[in-house]
Amino acid sequence: MESLLAPITSRIRGIYSPSELALVERAFERADSAHAGQLRKSGDPYITHPVAVAEILVEFGLDAPTLAAALLHDCVEDTNYSLDELRREFGDEVANLVDGVTKLDRLTYGPTAEAETVRKMVVAMAKDIRVLVIKLADRLHNARTWQFVNPESASRKGQETLDIYAPLAHRLGMNAVKWELEDLSFKYTEPKKYEEIERLVAERSPSRDKLTNEVVRDVQADLENENIESSVTGRQKHLYSIYQKMLVRGRAFDDIYDLVGIRVLVEDVRDCYAVLGAIHARWSPVPGRFKDYIAMPKMNLYQSLHTTVIGPNGKAVEIQIRTHEMHRRAEYGIAAHWKYKLDGRKSGATSDSPDVLWLKQLQIGRAHV
């Protein structure tokens, strides 16, 4: 079974210290032993779940105690391994993280509960922000395997995720997690609507992709002429986001899906505004659609320039412009702090970085997240 851990150890070896690597390996061995003989609904050995949760956290760049806690997070709840034993073997930091996740697992969410109240309870109960990040990774992997549970249970868990966990991911700035949780939940709460939008997307994709590629080529050519190093890509449309816009705006699918979106990533803030100037020189901006979230970041530290222009063939094009660092934070949110911290061992991360200051604010005001 140790080969299960290989994708994790190969990623963290050389980044974690030998003692940190040993901590993660010991946590895996204990979890593997504690869950011996247990199976998931899919028929896979239970240990595959905590390992998958830890893999998600490795992608975020979380620290060694968090990975250890992720590997052990179901032991106290689902095996004979007690919290006291865990504390003696792994210390207070890992034990407190596991205890925090266990308490969240025991929180019940009924049909009469106010989602906002439950979200505040979840945040207030987590004395360490890392508990919330582990719980989100736990919910994400479970959501990826809902096809193995009965439809009623999957639908119930999907609604709970839309009400509590996806908004929580958004408030923590973890947009990559939020979008995947929303799409997976949508698939099981509204299967017919999900399939219909999925079908429409598949039908319209060729023509939309053609226009997207044309816009990307034009922007790349302009930026090369300006000697601006950049990465220009089309932006994926998420099915749940399309559905929500259809509901809220009362618009037809074609009105929403046909709107082409691209993202431009550059090295520094000065280049962001240079890119904006180059794009507005090529295409006319739509009045009232420019947002400067670089000068005025969102509460979760999201930063980007947003503009909508009238592109080729008179089609509206939504464009996001930001630095690679801003994109990292936009994707991973609060989890980006630990990735920054790990990277900073070699690059000299400082305690007054925006990530660290934001983390301090969240720790002080958890109940208001």
Language-model segment annotations:
Residues 1-317, 322-366:
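Active-site helical microenvironments for divalent-metal-assisted chemistry
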